[in-house]
Amino acid sequence: MRVADFSFDLPDELIARYPTAQRNASRLLTLSGENSELADKKFTDLFNLINPGDLMVFNNTRVIPARLFGQKSTGGKLEILVERMLDDKRILAHVRSSKSPKVDTLIDLDGGYQMKMLARHDALFELELQSDKTILEVLEDVGHMPLPPYIDRPDEDTDKERYQTVYNQTPGAVAAPTAGLHFDDAMLADLKAKGVNIAFVTLHVGAGTFQPVRVDNVLEHKMHSEWANVSQEVVDLIAQTKAAGNRVVAVGTTSVRSLESAARASGDSPLEAFSGDTDIFIYPGFQFKVVDAMVTNFHLPESTLIMLLSAFAGYEAVMKAYQHAITQKYRFFSYGDAMFVTKKAP
């Protein structure tokens, strides 16, 4: 397939630049993978679409304030976007500057901190903090929330709360697992009271999630790598859910990628726990082994995420659903509305 097959025209006014007043006040478009039927609903209607005994799997990564501003010793300004924390002092990062910093040069950050340029790894720079504090402490002190480029505004204080799920736990993401932004504590409590099981995986979403696909042929795309963890407890819950004839519902494409990465690593054996880097690329033709349904936001044209959704529910059904969403003026991308999608028949 061609990357251009996943293109669509989106009016600029449908890009959500701020979240709804309440987390669960967004709209929900349902898409049945079995028959391609669409239905316009409210996000709170999701409660009626999840059955007792179903297992909902959330990504509990915490978004770090990963954007830093500073200047080189020459006085030139630069912007750092953390891709990954290597340890308490070192990061891999994207650096935006008129000229790339050279090895061993020092970078002065806002707040009086300094970083040293250690090495370059293709498009990423390895930087070391010159401070008694940890990277995480410095980010919490002077870092900015890494809003996606299409939101096209400076981050605000409210983004520290709203560009973060209510169940976040493990710091490391530089982009939010956005399907989870719609859930508040009350809705999670209601789902549990209904008999829905809740589980958590971790995938630290990297800045690569915003990188465009730069090839014409889908098969030639090289996926960026991210760290994920699927515990034995989650594996056991999945086995129990499947054995009882119930569904595994992934909240967000990052949860999907975590679970299917574990399945890929397990090979032909029963599902096993997984912890490590994953570069899984899911596109039409992929055989899903774990996930039966998913909650997801509306994704960018020609992105790997709309390819994943097309693999899950069928290419034609997804493109038709997106045209419907545009016609009905759904809000798109990270702060936008959501979909509930069931897997297409084999």
UniProtKB/Swiss-Prot annotation:
Protein EC: 2.4.99.17
User: Which residue ranges run through the membrane?
Assistant: none
Q: Which UniProt keyword terms apply here?
A: Cytoplasm, Queuosine biosynthesis, S-adenosyl-L-methionine, Transferase
Tell me the SUPFAM superfamilies matching this sequence.
QueA-like
The record's catalysed reaction(s) read: 7-aminomethyl-7-carbaguanosine(34) in tRNA + S-adenosyl-L-methionine = epoxyqueuosine(34) in tRNA + adenine + L-methionine + 2 H(+)
Question: Which pathway or pathways does this protein act in?
Answer: tRNA modification; tRNA-queuosine biosynthesis
What Pfam families does the record tag this protein with?
Answer: Queuosine_synth
Per the UniProt entry, the disulfide pairs are none
Location within or outside the cell: Cytoplasm
Assigned GO CC terms: cytoplasm
Where primarily located? cytoplasm
Q: Which GO terms describe its biological process?
A: queuosine biosynthetic process; tRNA wobble guanine modification
A molecular-function term among this protein's GO annotations: S-adenosylmethionine:tRNA ribosyltransferase-isomerase activity
Subunit and interaction comment: Monomer.
| Similarity field | Belongs to the QueA family.
Q: What does this protein do?
A: Transfers and isomerizes the ribose moiety from AdoMet to the 7-aminomethyl group of 7-deazaguanine (preQ1-tRNA) to give epoxyqueuosine (oQ-tRNA).
What is the name listed in the Swiss-Prot or TrEMBL entry for this protein?
Answer: S-adenosylmethionine:tRNA ribosyltransferase-isomerase
Organism equals Shewanella frigidimarina (strain NCIMB 400)
